[in-house]
């Protein structure tokens, strides 16, 4: 179904582009943001085959909300939804997301797959991710990009809906519901 004006956002499915830190990986305590997931669990993410920019093995404690992860997994499981990771975790992003409980299909695109953990600065991250996601939008895919570096809330421009989160609270329940709605669920 296409809404009046032919918005690309009226079709089911599309790209769900996720950062990890500040989106799925949260502060240990509730940030007091309306609608935030308040359950927290500490996960030690270990990717021993990789080294970070300091030549140390990748092994980091992160905090996640199991309830949020379950809700995001439901969005990833919607028909036609394609997961894209856009995180400075670089080559470790897929494994980090999986260890945190995220459903990461084999078809996932990790925009920074070949990059060392910590080697992607935020300006480069945003520019390179935007280039990739613009290609997706130009090919007719609906794109929803969630990152704590975006302006807070939901903004659509150039065929991409950006979702700005609080770096401490990450995705909130209402945000996940809106993302689900945008991707046809």
Question: What residue spans do the PLM features occupy?
Answer:
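Alpha-helical substrate-recognition element adjacent to the catalytic core
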Residues: 2-5, 9-115
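C-terminal cap/substrate-recognition subdomain and adjoining C-terminal extension
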Residues: 94-185
